[in-house]
Amino acid sequence: MVKLRLKRCGRKQRAVYRIVAIDARSRREGRDLRKVGFYDPIKNQTYSNVPAILYFLEKGAQPTGTVHDISKKAEVFTELRLNQTKFKFNQ
């Protein structure tokens, strides 16, 4: 199973996180499948590669709680619903 979760980067006391698609059995710092975003909690900055996140969500990836909240703020799930309705109408 693939998960969308945070991977810690940065130095001591100055953590920044990458949002990555990674196998659920891998450790936090393990090899990721793809980097799909960035989150800096200190500066409160976020970058999300929305097409990549949508790709993994459509393939069945499960976001962790924090990644879910970050994606909700970036309105990724509204775009996912729009893509699903377009897909249903095309069939």
Swiss-Prot record:
It is found in: Plastid, Chloroplast. One of its GO terms (biological process) is translation. The keyword Zinc does not apply. PROSITE patterns: RIBOSOMAL_S16. GO terms for cellular component: chloroplast; small ribosomal subunit. Keywords: Chloroplast, Plastid, Ribonucleoprotein, Ribosomal protein. It holds the Pfam family Ribosomal_S16. GO terms for molecular function: structural constituent of ribosome. Disulfide bonds: none annotated. Belongs to the bacterial ribosomal protein bS16 family. This is Small ribosomal subunit protein bS16c. It comes from Vitis vinifera.
